[in-house]
């Protein structure tokens, strides 16, 4: 395969929420610096584009999950996956990031060259199979922590003898029909807490299995304080105010439960 060399100031790996945020900051604060965002998949969004399971939504409010520089203007502060994708697309358009994102470009390796004081990054164009070597002063790893090829699947004894369907949320077929069926959800983490209420609307019976007891807090998906303040104050100011409040309350809760 042919190897072409390119020199950049910054290389960003991943066009999910972190990579898009990094690009927006570069365009705003470092407009004269050169950079590219390499995304191995064919679309932006990362987790929010990959996961298609029922009820996919943010686990935290969008005032804290969203960007500090771009207010979240929807009524619901707990957002669905499609709404988050819209938010990210707006950010890409507003900050002209499309020309910076290289889709279907998989980063194969990254090595620090001590002699040149540069990162040497090998990139594969998955569509053409052509390989490139890029060099940069800085490397931003925004690839997240999920393995996109397959999710974690424990080896359950006897699973091969099970006559029903075993579905992993990470590879949930959009055509999956669970109406009037009995469903067992293994685990009680954020994904399970999202899926169970949604499939319970149509399934005959839904049972969640958990190994360790946990606490659930019932919270509204609309922030009434934020909606009230937006009637009198600029939305950008309200967004920053609610963001500060929520971060403070989350830190306070975290410290209390550890006490």
Language model features with spans:
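Short, Lys/Arg-enriched N-terminal segments with co-localized hydrophobic residues
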Residues: 1-2
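Structural signal for conserved beta-strand scaffold positions within catalytic alpha/beta enzyme cores
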Residues: 66, 103, 109, 166-169, ...
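Residues that form or immediately flank small-molecule/cofactor binding pockets and catalytic motifs
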Residues: 42, 72, 106, 112, ...
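Rossmann-like dinucleotide-binding core of oxidoreductases
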Residues: 6-7, 11-12, 17, 21-43, ...
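Beta1-alpha1 glycine-rich phosphate/pyrophosphate-binding loop at the start
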Residues: 8-13, 17-101, 210-211
């Amino acid at each position: 395969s042919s190897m072409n060399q390119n020199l950049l100031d910054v290389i960003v790996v991943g066009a999910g929420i972190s990579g898009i945020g990094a690009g927006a900051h570069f365009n705003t604060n470092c407009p004269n610096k050169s950079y590219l965002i390499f995304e191995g998949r064919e679309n932006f969004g990362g987790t929010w584009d990959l996961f298609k399971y029922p009820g996919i939504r943010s686990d935290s409010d969008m005032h804290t999950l969203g960007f500090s520089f771009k207010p979240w203007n929807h009524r619901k502060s707990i957002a669905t996956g499609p709404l988050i994708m819209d938010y990210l697309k707006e950010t890409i358009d507003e900050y002209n990031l499309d020309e910076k994102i290289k889709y279907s470009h998989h980063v194969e390796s990254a090595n620090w060259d001590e002699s040149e004081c540069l990162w040497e990054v090998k990139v594969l164009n998955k569509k053409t199979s052509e390989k490139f070597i890029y060099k940069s002063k800085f490397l931003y790893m925004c690839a997240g922590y999920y393995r996109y090829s397959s999710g974690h699947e424990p080896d359950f004894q006897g699973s091969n003898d099970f006559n029903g369907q075993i579905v992993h949320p990470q590879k949930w077929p959009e055509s999956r029909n669970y109406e009037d069926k009995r469903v067992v959800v293994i685990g009680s983490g954020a994904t399970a807490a999202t899926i169970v209420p949604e499939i319970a609307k149509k399934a005959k019976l839904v049972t969640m299995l958990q190994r360790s007891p946990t606490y659930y807090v019932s919270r509204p998906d609309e922030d009434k304080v934020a909606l009230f303040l937006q009637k009198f104050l600029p939305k950008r100011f309200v967004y920053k105010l609610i963001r500060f409040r929520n971060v403070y309350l989350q830190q306070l809760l975290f410290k209390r439960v550890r006490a």
